[in-house]
């Protein structure tokens, strides 16, 4: 076979290193083991990147996809962390970054009738590795839709209170053992006025309406509730919780964030 020119490995004279270069928007089938020991097949949108020293013109894009394919579809915290390490090896890089975002489904029964339905959540794995550090960084994020009901509206109004759907983006790093995706979702849902369901009959709708009315929370309450539960859990070394409410009486969102390092 004729030897082809390797343009990427040529020298670059501009003396500017690149923080991250790679591929993004790559869709890849994966399998996730859930808390009930079942394998869930889903499709992840993947980003893979490494640093590029100033002396090199380009990186080798095909090697990113090769590294992903080598590790197969079944992913957990341990197998996923092998991917950024493999990028370091294949591309002779000093730092690597991998991000995978995918829909995660779980069965959820309606609160009164017990009718089963599937709820979908967005889950994100973010991993970084460095050539001079044996410990790779892993961050798990769940994006959980919830219901919130306004405490101020309830206190002032003779009839009802405004309520809305919100999104909680909850990210954690683990201090020791990993925590199941489902447990993170449950933690967030327990802090809202009410959780969401995909199937509700009339008795269920009555129940969720009254449940939200009995548990009013501001967006500030929501992030503080999640923060308190996180800080009481020894499994976490860091967290970030962001809540966004799609206000039903405004054409804008309400928003709050808490981020803490729990190692000190």
Curated annotation (Swiss-Prot):
It is an enzyme of class 3 (hydrolase). Pfam families: GCHY-1 (PF02649). Keywords: Hydrolase. One of its GO terms (molecular function) is GTP cyclohydrolase I activity. GO terms for biological process: tetrahydrofolate biosynthetic process. Pathway: Cofactor biosynthesis; 7,8-dihydroneopterin triphosphate biosynthesis; 7,8-dihydroneopterin triphosphate from GTP: step 1/1. It comes from the Bacteria. Belongs to the GTP cyclohydrolase IV family. Converts GTP to 7,8-dihydroneopterin triphosphate. This is GTP cyclohydrolase FolE2.
């Amino acid at each position: 076979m004729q030897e082809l020119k390797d343009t990427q490995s040529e020298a670059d004279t501009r003396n500017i290193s690149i923080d991250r270069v790679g591929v993004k928007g790559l869709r890849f089938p994966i399998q996730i083991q859930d808390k009930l020991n079942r394998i869930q097949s889903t499709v992840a949108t993947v980003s893979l990147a490494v640093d590029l020293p100033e002396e090199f013109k380009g990186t080798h894009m095909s090697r990113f996809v090769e590294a992903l394919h080598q590790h197969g579809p079944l992913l957990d915290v341990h197998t996923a962390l092998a991917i950024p390490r493999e990028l370091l090896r294949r591309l002779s890089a000093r730092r690597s970054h991998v991000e995978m975002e995918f829909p995660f489904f779980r069965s959820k029964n309606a609160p009164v009738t017990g009718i089963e339905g599937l709820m979908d959540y967005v889950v994100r794995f973010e991993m970084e590795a460095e050539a001079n550090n044996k410990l790779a960084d892993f961050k798990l994020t769940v994006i959980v839709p919830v219901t919130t009901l306004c405490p101020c509206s309830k206190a002032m109004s003779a009839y009802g209170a405004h309520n809305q759907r919100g999104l909680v983006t909850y990210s954690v790093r683990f201090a020791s053992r990993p925590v199941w995706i489902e447990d993170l979702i449950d933690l967030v849902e327990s802090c809202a006025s009410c959780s969401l369901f995909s199937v509700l009959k009339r008795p269920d709708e009555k129940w969720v309406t009254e449940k939200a009315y009995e548990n009013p929370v501001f967006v500030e309450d929501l992030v503080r509730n999640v923060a308190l539960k996180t800080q009481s859990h020894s499994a976490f070394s860091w967290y970030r919780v962001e809540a966004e409410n799609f206000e039903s009486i405004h054409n804008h969102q309400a928003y709050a964030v808490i981020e803490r390092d729990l190692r000190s």
